[in-house]
Swiss-Prot record:
Gene: NDC80
Name the UniProt record assigns to this protein: Probable kinetochore protein NDC80
Keyword RNA-binding: no
Subcellular location: Nucleus; Chromosome, Centromere, Kinetochore
Gene3D superfamilies the UniProt entry points to: Ncd80 complex, Ncd80 subunit (1.10.418.30)
Length: 726
């Protein structure tokens, strides 16, 4: 009878609740299934076929289907050969009863008691992408820099005072059984840091147990808490927190204190108002969570033989308390809604009065649009008319000026004609002579105009040549300046330079100062200095402009200088190659020395670390002894100053300690009684369950025996029984 029948067993590993979603998809335990006899068993007494109770109707809103949770099985699949009719509805597939395999539960209507927990339709918009506090995020590249001024003494004193006040407020010394001195946050010992870190982390995660050394425990915990600067903390620093590293660990303790305060505030609903300001109402979620947690706790504590009515009676107070909490939560919204409805009615009435007292808005809008269109058209027409008027005014002014000029010219022509007529009359010239003279004058005027036109063309060409010559002269001056600069750089200028060898290489433009290449002939006088020529028939030569013969002596000097520089360059290259070989040898020697220096530096660092550790231990011991001596001296002085006052204080402390001890004794007795009661209840449940299992096994054995007798006969049954006994 050691076969696994698929029933629930106390030897199976305890099933976890798995992930609980926001709508509380908490699974229902197997103990909630109602076990009652069914008529399916026929003539068999105590039939093993279990009928499941119908689904209990919930008072809350419908909940989505329960998730598929896994449970492990430790039995075999021997019963699957033909005894499926005597089993209750299995929560696992028949093909996976091997040890260590996880099977999924199939939650169906009727195989378990329906949960009273149903989903509520939240009125708050869904917030996606919730991120767990301990979820791992990609770490940024490099070691992040702490922006806090941890090296500042005033900042250290302030955060140290905050940490000390927080520990005193939450009974650090009583919980950790460790006394802290006043200077513990200025020069702490390794033991002080260990106690403070463990206590602060227990404020964040009370169920954590420290089992390793502190230098091995802290790094993974910092990664789990997602401390932003955990990469800047090494194990060697954790093993020696004093000295220069204390500011870093003081910032770590302050950050953990703030994190613990934030978690306490979250538990104490301190951020509900901030959620309300952000438009998220969490009061309903808290009511639902309290209902689910309290109701589920009582539901698990119920006896599995209770009926649906008794279960509903047990859960009814929780439903009523949830309804009352929702009524209290919704009362302010109801009053606000009433106020808003009254305000809405008042505003609607005002709108109706305004609509009655004012014309139709549609007609007004239509008229307004027409007037806007007319306004735009009038503005455009006005702008066009203004432009035309300005144009006509300017044109009329110009025409008036031209008319005045024409009138003046006409008057002058009339006067000239009258004067000429008088002169002609006085000379006695006939009209034929006047016509002939006029024709000759016109011919000469045309000749003068053609000559003037040719002269203008010649002057234009000459001015272009002058501009080109001036540009060429500017370019020549720039090239001479660039030549002189480069010659000075390569030591050719002055004549006393290294490469000049007493010769003159400096170029100069020797054009006469009184020559003006930019003066146009059209505007120049008869002087030859304003021409681009030396005289009326000769222009400037290259030798007249530059002081040196570039194509002769200067070119030969440059060729010889280039050859000499090439020889010196070849010699310098040979010397440089030799120097490079020597430098490579020196570098190899330096690398060897550098390796030796690094080895010595490593030994020095190891010695310095050992020295620092020894110094820290010695300093800590010295500080502890100094603090103890100072404390003893202060106590001695206080005892000498006022012995009677100390006696009264000690008596009062003794009275307080006695009262506290009595209270602790009473609390311990009450807790002991509560634990004894709980243990008795659990033992009773275990005994009842054991009796139930034994009874079920006996019934099952009898049922199997009857089945085998029917199918195989009494002889075969006896042989099978002997085989089973063997």
């Amino acid at each position: 009878m050691s076969q696994d029948t698929g029933l629930w067993s106390v030897r199976r590993p305890r099933e976890t609740l798995g992930g609980i979603s926001a709508n509380s998809a908490i699974p229902q335990p197997g103990s909630t299934m109602k076990r009652s006899s069914s008529n399916i068993g026929g003539n068999y007494p105590g039939s093993h076929v279990r009928s499941m109770s119908g689904s209990r109707h919930s008072l809350a809103m419908p909940r989505p289907s329960q998730p598929m949770f896994q449970r492990s099985s430790s039995g075999t699949n021997l019963v699957d050969l033909g005894l499926s009719s005597v089993k209750r509805s299995s929560f696992a597939p028949k093909s996976t009863f091997t040890p260590g395999t996880a099977t999924k539960r199939a939650s169906t209507d009727g195989d378990r008691r329906s949960s009273v927990y149903r989903p509520r339709q939240s009125t708050v918009p869904a917030v996606s992408h919730h991120q767990s506090f301990f979820q791992t995020t990609p770490a940024p590249a490099g070691v992040p820099r702490d922006p806090r001024p941890l090296k500042d003494r005033s900042f250290q004193a302030r955060i140290g005072q905050e940490i000390m006040e927080y520990m005193v407020q939450h009974n650090f010394e009583m919980e950790m059984k460790h006394v802290l001195s006043q200077n513990v946050l200025k020069s702490p010992t390794q033991k002080d840091f260990n106690y403070m870190f463990q206590w602060l982390y227990h404020r964040i995660d009370p169920s954590h147990k420290f089992q390793k050394n502190i230098d091995q425990e802290v790094p993974p915990l910092l990664k789990q808490m997602r401390y932003p600067f955990e990469r800047s903390i090494t194990k060697s620093q954790i093993a020696a927190v004093g000295g220069q590293n204390w500011s870093t660990f003081l910032g770590l303790l302050h950050w953990m204190m703030q994190l613990a305060q934030m978690l306490d505030g979250y538990v104490n609903c301190q951020y509900d108002e901030a959620c309300m300001e952000a438009g998220i109402d969490v009061s309903g979620d808290r009511i639902i969570f309290d209902f689910l947690s309290n109701g589920y706790r009582d539901w698990l504590a119920m006896d599995e033989d209770l009926g649906d009515e008794e279960a509903e009676r047990v859960l009814a107070p929780h439903v009523q308390s949830m309804a009352a909490a929702f009524e209290r939560s919704n009362s302010k919204y109801t009053s606000e809604l009433d106020m808003l409805e009254a305000e809405n009615a008042r505003l609607l009435k005002e709108i109706e009065d305004l609509e009655k007292s004012t014309p139709d808005p549609a007609v007004l809008d239509h008229h307004f649009k027409i007037m806007e269109e007319d306004k735009v058209k009038f503005e455009e027409y006005n702008a066009l008319a203004m432009q035309r008027s300005e144009k006509y005014e300017s044109r009329s002014q110009v025409l008036q000026e031209e008319l005045d000029k024409l009138l003046e010219e006409l008057q002058e022509a009339d006067e000239e004609r009258r004067s000429l007529q008088k002169a002609v009359d006085a000379q006695g010239i006939s009209m034929q002579d006047i016509d002939r003279m006029t024709a000759e004058r016109e011919r000469l005027q045309r000749g003068i105009e053609s000559a003037s036109q040719r002269l203008e063309e010649v002057k234009k060409k000459v001015s272009e040549r002058e501009a080109e010559a001036s540009r060429k002269l500017d370019e020549l001056e720039q090239m001479v300046d660039r030549y002189n600069t480069m010659a000075y750089q390569i030591a050719l200028i002055p004549s006393t330079a290294a490469n000049a060898k007493g010769r003159e290489f400096e170029l100069q433009v020797t054009v006469a100062d009184d020559s003006d290449f930019t003066t146009s002939i059209m505007k120049s006088g008869p002087s030859s200095a304003d021409r681009l020529v030396v005289d009326s028939t000769t222009g400037h030569q290259a030798g007249h402009i530059l002081n040196l013969d570039l194509r002769g002596k200067i070119r030969n000097s440059f060729i010889s200088l280039r050859k000499e520089i090439s020889d010196r360059r070849a010699t310098a290259m040979d010397e440089m190659i030799k120097d490079h070989d020597l430098l490579d040898g020196i570098k190899e020697a330096i690398e060897d020395r550098r390796g030796e220096v690094e080895a010595l530096n490593h030994r020095v660092r190891a010695a310095e670390e050992e020295y620092e550790k020894t110094k820290e231990v010695t300093t800590a011991q010295k500080l502890a002894s100094d603090a103890h001596i100072e404390k003893m001296e202060k106590e001695l002085s206080r005892m000498r100053a006022g012995l009677s006052e100390n006696v009264q204080i000690l008596e009062q402390r003794e009275i307080n300690t006695t009262i506290e001890y009595e209270q602790l004794v009473l609390q311990a007795n009450a807790l002991r009684e509560e634990l004894h009661t709980e243990i008795d209840r659990m033992l009773n449940d275990v005994i009842k369950f054991k009796i139930h299992v034994q009874k079920s096994l006996d019934d099952y054995e009898g049922f199997v025996t009857e089945e085998l007798e029917k199918e195989l006969g009494s002889d075969e049954m006896q042989e099978d029984t002997q085989r089973m006994d063997m």
